[in-house]
Regions:
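Secondary-structure "cap/kink" motif recognition
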Residues: 1-366
Length: 366
């Protein structure tokens, strides 16, 4: 076999088929036609025109069976532990002023659009760039996965067109950052350095032996899950079409705006009108200013400044018949927004002024 290079083969291939096993060894090329010498264990040497080694140029990365994020229709429950510690539940029965709300934590609604975007980021997580395919305890510590920054436990389900559940399960995902690199990054922040070092981020599915490197943007998107990040940023979340009248208090004066439905309420092409002191006006500027009023950050700080404006919106909603919003001046940049008497958020004073000006345009134009 030595003359064919089969005493020290360049490749040995072990094949098992049922109860049979075979060993194929690849030797040198023939000098005449550059064909490969092979042995299949039957004591003979063969020349093959197609080199079997061409089919075995895959590296380990090509052969790993990567973990995957399952496809599902509904996230029934999402639990966070680590940097955040709370649970989100999917509930179509709980009442909320926003008809689209189906995700809640401790009875408080979250923004369905934001949760959906987060779930999309989870679905699209790229689990291909492995850093360990048989992770050890020492490696877990090196990757920061012995104490993950965030652990996500998601109970999911899928249903057919008739609403019958076809699949369900639980996904556990651990996310971390390299501890040494993170410490260097935080030190650079503290020292106000101009150039900040990179921090490697990792993901691990459940107790899988495979650990993946993920991008910083993927890590940031999946770990930005504080209650304030996932709750509604807009102050008024009801459908404005459910508003039937508005009581306004501005600079000590009271005003009432009234919605007048069309005579034929079943005709979708006919719109109702808004009036103030029996004068019809266009509600768009007011409704837009109200709908874009959003939190710059959230607070429970009691207001001490001057009241800028107060609105009580009457809604065609048995569970939430009224919504009262009062804005108090904080400084030249911000106001404190109180909803039904409770401080909720800081809002831009510019946006508050837009709302005030929309009211003045109606009252002064009547």
């Amino acid at each position: 076999y030595a003359q064919y290079g089969l005493d020290e083969p360049v490749c040995t291939i072990h094949i098992t088929a049922g109860e049979e096993s075979y060993t194929v060894t690849l030797g040198d090329f023939s000098k005449m036609d550059e064909q490969r010498y092979i042995s299949i264990g039957d004591g003979k040497v063969y020349l093959v025109s197609h080199d079997p080694l061409d089919e075995f140029d895959a590296v380990l990365r090509d052969m790993i069976l990567d973990d995957t994020i399952p496809e599902f229709d509904t996230a029934k429950q999402i639990a966070f532990t680590g940097s955040e510690n709370y649970t989100i539940s999917y509930d179509e029965e709980t009442k909320s002023i926003c008809a689209d709300d189906v995700y809640f934590t401790d009875g408080k609604p979250l923004d369905t659009a934001v949760i959906t975007e987060w779930l999309t980021s989870l679905h699209e997580l790229d689990l291909t760039n492995y850093v360990s395919y048989n992770v050890t305890d020492e490696e877990l510590e090196t990757f920061g996965l012995d104490e993950p920054a965030l652990a996500i436990t998601l109970d999911y389900s899928s249903s057919d067109e008739d609403g019958n559940e076809t699949d369900s399960g639980t996904l556990v995902l651990h996310l971390s950052q390299n501890p040494e690199e993170l410490a260097a990054y935080e030190e650079a922040i503290a020292n106000e350095e101009d150039v900040l070092p990179d921090v490697t981020c990792y993901a691990r599915v459940g107790d899988s032996q495979i650990v993946y490197q993920i991008t910083q943007s993927e890590f940031d998107a999946l770990t930005d899950v504080s209650y304030d990040a996932l709750r509604h940023q807009k102050i008024f979340t009801a459908d404005f079409d459910t508003v039937t009248s508005i009581d306004v208090t501005l600079e000590g004066e009271d005003y009432i705006f009234t919605y007048n439905p069309p005579e034929d309420e079943d005709d979708a092409d006919v719109e109702g009108t808004w009036t103030y002191q029996d004068t019809e006006f266009d509600i768009f500027d007011f409704s837009y200013a109200l709908r874009v009023l959003s939190a710059t950050s959230f607070t429970d700080e009691a207001p001490t400044g001057q009241e800028e404006i107060s609105l009580t919106l009457h809604l065609d909603n048995e569970d939430f018949p009224t919504f009262t919003l009062t804005l108090y001046r904080l400084d030249g940049e911000s106001c404190i927004a109180c909803v039904d008497g409770e401080s909720v958020a800081f809002v831009s004073r510019d946006k508050a002024v837009d709302l005030i000006e929309a009211v003045r345009a109606v009252t002064l134009g009547a």
